[in-house]
């Protein structure tokens, strides 16, 4: 059975659940899940956990995500992207400089409180926000704390004098739960000009990047290639201190027992027969199980 992570380069128009469904059919494996939902119109990195790797999904969510996209000053929509209803239009007489846009972006770096878009999957009283929006019901959107590690221009913005609009390409590295289109909208508010996101692509997530990604169609056409394309579970723990277990300690770990280790690391990856079998965490002077991966072969 396959155990590991396949990094999919998701096409526009598909949901993350669609990708999981198609992979289950192509590989004839039920134990498959995705780490980090991508909206249908967003393309790029979607890590898919298979077999024992599904145990990593919660950990995968904790790692930063990186996006590249395009924003536009000139109008704003209710969904914060170009698929929404236009709420405000305002021609730019003079374009923003690189310095002005970057200065605005810098104000969002660090830990911030963010209000999710009304057209989002966030739930209020057991109901998705987009369901309230479709029914025309106003509801208070809950603020959430997210962290923005990077929000930068990728190149010089482009000004269309005839339309009075200015487009800009950006790169964002952020924590889970961040709505990038909200950051584009909020940048517009910061600079007192309506703004909308016109394009978004995720280029890294959960420690994997777009260079490791494959198209879903490639796997569907050649399911047997999945074993060549899959990232081993051990690759996810490349930043952990790894300790090879002698037979005696492996027998203890296999039974979930605490063990002593000659290290000061808070968490360690324990390996046996060249495979990570468990993640142990320091509890006082003893290391105890945090995540068991005994079937990682």
UniProtKB/Swiss-Prot annotation:
Keywords: Isomerase, tRNA processing. One of its GO terms (biological process) is tRNA pseudouridine synthesis. It is an enzyme of class 5 (isomerase). It catalyses: uridine(55) in tRNA = pseudouridine(55) in tRNA. GO terms for molecular function: RNA binding; tRNA pseudouridine(55) synthase activity. The active site is at residue 39. InterPro entries: PsdUridine_synth_cat_dom_sf, PsdUridine_synth_N, tRNA_psdUridine_synth_TruB, TruB_C. Its EC number is 5.4.99.25. Gene3D superfamilies: Pseudouridine synthase (3.30.2350.10). HAMAP family: TruB_bact. Responsible for synthesis of pseudouridine from uracil-55 in the psi GC loop of transfer RNAs. Belongs to the pseudouridine synthase TruB family. Type 1 subfamily. This is tRNA pseudouridine synthase B. It comes from Lactobacillus acidophilus (strain ATCC 700396 / NCK56 / N2 / NCFM).
């Amino acid at each position: 059975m396959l155990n590991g992570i396949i990094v999919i380069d998701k096409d526009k128009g598909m949901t993350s659940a669609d990708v999981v469904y198609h992979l289950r059919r192509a590989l004839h494996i039920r134990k498959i899940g995705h780490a980090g939902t991508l909206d249908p119109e967003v393309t790029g990195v979607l890590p898919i956990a298979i077999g024992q790797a599904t145990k990593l999904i919660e950990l995968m969510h904790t790692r930063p995500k990186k996006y590249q996209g395009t924003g536009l000053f000139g109008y704003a929509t209710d969904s914060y992207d170009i698929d929404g209803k236009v709420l405000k239009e305002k021609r730019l007489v003079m374009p923003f400089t690189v310095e002005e846009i970057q200065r605005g972006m810098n104000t969002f770096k660090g830990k911030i409180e963010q209000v999710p878009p009304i057209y989002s999957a966030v739930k209020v009283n057991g109901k998705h926000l987009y369901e309230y929006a479709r029914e025309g019901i106003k509801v208070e959107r809950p603020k959430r704390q997210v962290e923005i590690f990077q929000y930068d221009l990728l190149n010089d913005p482009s000004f269309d004098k005839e339309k009075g609009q200015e487009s800009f390409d950006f790169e964002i590295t952020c924590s889970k739960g961040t709505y990038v289109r909200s950051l584009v909208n909020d940048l517009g508010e910061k600079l007192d000009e309506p703004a909308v996101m016109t394009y978004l692509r995720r280029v890294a997530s959960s420690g994997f990047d777009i260079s490791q990604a494959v198209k879903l169609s490639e796997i569907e056409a050649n399911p047997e290639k999945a074993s060549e394309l899959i990232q081993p579970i051990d690759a996810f723990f490349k930043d952990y201190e790894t300790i090879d277990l002698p037979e005696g300690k492996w027998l203890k770990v296999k039974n979930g027992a605490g063990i002593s280790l000659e290290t000061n690391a808070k968490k360690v990856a324990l390996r046996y027969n060249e495979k990570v079998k468990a993640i142990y965490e320091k509890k006082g002077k003893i290391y105890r199980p945090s995540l068991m991966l005994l079937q990682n072969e």
